[in-house]
């Protein structure tokens, strides 16, 4: 829509969102780059959304972001923070503890901003180094390495209080484009 209107839109509690949360049985909200302007705005938005959902339904919301590390780190980019390394870089290390540490740091970052779910971990097995959208979003082209690293990341997110939404399986594969 902003490409058509020339407008960018930052979601705030004043945009009718809270009325919607108080009226409808919403289970979750996904926030993207256009919903983010400052750390304070994001924290207020997520706090206000949780309060509205709790008041209406008695249970909180899933508040979802997508922070994979590397090139897919919307919040880090918008807020001027440095993201964790990409899955590809971490996978090349062969060290699952580095993956756990990166996922734990991302979980802490997300919780601080009010997110409790992350559209990550990519469990895709890289089919080629080029010609695919996945690229460094995959831990490896080796299924065993991907499984080990994805499980390490998934566990670290859960231990850190963030629900990981594991994606790209059975695989994005060698598809060109999303």
Regions found by a protein language model. Give the residues of each.
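Boundary/entry segment of secreted carbohydrate-active catalytic domains
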Residues: 1-13
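Phosphate/pyrophosphate-binding betaalpha-module
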Residues: 154-170, 176
């Amino acid at each position: 829509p902003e490409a058509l209107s020339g407008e960018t839109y930052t979601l705030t509690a004043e945009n009718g969102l809270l009325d919607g949360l108080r009226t409808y049985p919403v289970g979750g909200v996904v926030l993207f780059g256009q919903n983010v302007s400052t750390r304070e705005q994001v924290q207020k938005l997520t706090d206000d959304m949780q309060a509205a959902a709790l008041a209406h339904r008695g249970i909180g919301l899933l508040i979802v972001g997508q922070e994979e590390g590397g090139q897919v780190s919307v919040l880090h980019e918008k807020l001027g923070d440095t993201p964790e390394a990409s899955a590809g870089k971490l996978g090349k290390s062969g060290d699952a503890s580095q993956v756990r540490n990166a996922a734990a740091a991302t979980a802490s970052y997300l919780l601080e901003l009010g997110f409790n779910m992350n559209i990550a971990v990519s469990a895709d097995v890289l089919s080629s180094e080029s010609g695919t959208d996945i690229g460094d979003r995959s831990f490896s082209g080796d299924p065993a390495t991907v499984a080990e690293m994805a499980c390490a990341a998934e566990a670290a997110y859960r231990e850190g209080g963030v629900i990981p939404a594991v994606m790209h399986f059975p695989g994005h594969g060698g598809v060109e484009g999303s």
